[in-house]
Amino acid sequence: MSRVPSIPAAEAWARVQRGEARLLDLRTELERRRYGWPPGAQRVALAQHVVRPGGPDTIYLCQHANRSKLTGRRGASEVRDGWQGWLDAGLPVERT
């Protein structure tokens, strides 16, 4: 498995906003309910994306930037520092 490129949360959000990438949330539904999620981020199962990872337009987000490293093929990238990186960048969060 190749290394997953890690990008700052602000860059990930900018790419999503420009329509250049999609943000996939690898966290569990419990984590999303507890901590919130980025607007428009689709929750996906890790197992599905280890077998068939996304391409260069895919950015993965997980709680601590660990699970996303398992998807590192075909040019997908991850949000550096995971959910904490997202929060530290002051990016939008949705909650129920």
Give the positions of each predicted feature:
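Rhodanese-like catalytic fold shared by cysteine-dependent sulfurtransferases
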Residues: 1-22, 29-96
